[in-house]
């Protein structure tokens, strides 16, 4: 990142971890001087409402009225994705301050999203670490498989949120193999007819959600209890439990699968 210049003007992404400074329901706009940012470093990461968008180097001690990134899923996709870019870039920079090959200090490259080792004898270049995770909706006839994960424990007597299955891709594994493995590990079910649906950047802290649709093949539900509280089949015409929020690829997968169920 470069030192911010007094004349730099645009929208500014200021954040700590996944908390965004979002006053008046938008990012702050103005010159660096008017926003008291001239002592900071930043990088331009795109355009926001026709103006440059800068992400400011993260300061963990910064105190502001924050808005959780998850709550901004309601924004148009292109805006939410830009916020993810900035948050992930700062996460990459703060976790790669030193070269993983020789241990010397790194600095951000000028020609691409990367950090460059400052040891002339090394010069190793490291790129942002993006951890792909599959997310899959499984259909059986007119039914959809939904699960209540341990991180969505029911509260106040409710049923808790039910959603799709997901998991990280392992080394030497295709996305389709990950779908098969994750579904089987978490529920004991085998799936077939796996097909790509879409993807979503997910800065929690550095994932890429890769969405798939799949059909039930065989097996009975057997829970991986350290991951799931419950998993069951829901008929497309019956009342559904609490679902993921708008803007998530999980809800898009669920809605797409329900539409297929109703046409089956």
Swiss-Prot record:
Zn(2+) binds at residues 99, 102, 117, 122. Keywords: Hydrolase, Magnesium, Manganese, Metal-binding, NAD, Zinc. Residues 128-257 form the Nudix hydrolase domain. A divalent metal cation 2 binds at residue 182. A motif (Nudix box) lies at residues 167-188. GO terms for cellular component: cytosol. Its EC number is 3.6.1.-, 3.6.1.22. It comes from the Bacteria. A divalent metal cation 1 binds at residues 166, 186, 227. Belongs to the Nudix hydrolase family. NudC subfamily. This is NAD-capped RNA hydrolase NudC. It comes from Actinobacillus succinogenes (strain ATCC 55618 / DSM 22257 / CCUG 43843 / 130Z). The gene is nudC.
